[in-house]
A protein has these predicted regions:
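Charge-rich, solvent-exposed alpha-helical interaction surfaces
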Residues: 4, 8, 27, 42, ...
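Short, solvent-exposed loop/turn elements at domain surfaces
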Residues: 13, 98, 142-146
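Short inter-helical turns and helix N-cap capping residues of alpha-solenoid HEAT/ARM repeat scaffolds
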Residues: 13-17, 51-53, 93-94
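Terminal, low-structured helical/coil segments at or just beyond the last alpha-helical repeat
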Residues: 114-155
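Short amphipathic alpha-helical segments that mediate assembly, nucleic-acid/protein binding
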Residues: 2, 21, 39-40, 57, ...
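Structural detector for internal amphipathic alpha-helices that build alpha-solenoid repeat scaffolds
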Residues: 18-35, 55-76, 96-110
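Amphipathic alpha-helical scaffolding segments comprising HEAT/armadillo-like alpha-solenoid repeats
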Residues: 1-10, 34-48, 70-89, 112-118
């Protein structure tokens, strides 16, 4: 079932209904949310494919955001590919994709951590902020029992 959804998403036949692909992204995101690693892999690979329309890429970002939101209260080590993918999207050629990925990433920092990122800046100006996002990611995705693990404050 998951493989079939992946086929629907990756099928770039322009005659295919975009809404069918959109819905496949949505359903696959539901599976990915519950640690279905094959579903996560399909989504994280597809969202980086710049040949997809913004419409589909936004739905793919929404799909991985569900998994990311479940990761926020706990350790992010096991699903670190989701965070790494969102950070890669900060350097995407599409400013809308960069901005949406940034909105999702900020949720993991309680909207505090912007790290100076502005999706409208040019590639060179974005690099310092992306390095700060990568530094943050290396801390929050550290294995739970490692020396690098940062304990999150209780609310």
């Amino acid at each position: 079932f998951i493989a079939k959804l992946g086929e629907i998403i990756r099928d770039k036949d322009p005659k295919k209904d975009q809404d069918l692909r959109f819905n496949a992204c949505h359903v696959l995101g539901r599976y990915a949310k519950w640690r279905q690693l094959d579903a996560q892999e399909i989504i994280t690979d597809a969202v980086l494919d710049t040949s997809f329309t913004r419409y589909i890429r936004f739905q793919l970002i929404t799909a991985i955001s569900r998994t990311y939101e479940l990761m926020i209260p706990g350790n992010m080590h096991d699903d670190r590919k989701i965070i790494q993918t969102l950070i890669k999207l900060l350097d995407d050629s599409d400013g809308g994709v960069r901005g949406y990925a940034h909105i999702i990433l900020k949720k993991g920092t309680n909207d505090v951590g912007k790290f100076g990122f502005n999706p409208g800046h040019n590639k060179t100006d974005r690099q310092a902020a992306i390095r700060r996002w990568n530094d943050w990611a290396s801390q929050v995705t550290a294995p739970l029992l490692s020396d690098n693990f940062i304990k999150k404050p209780q609310k």
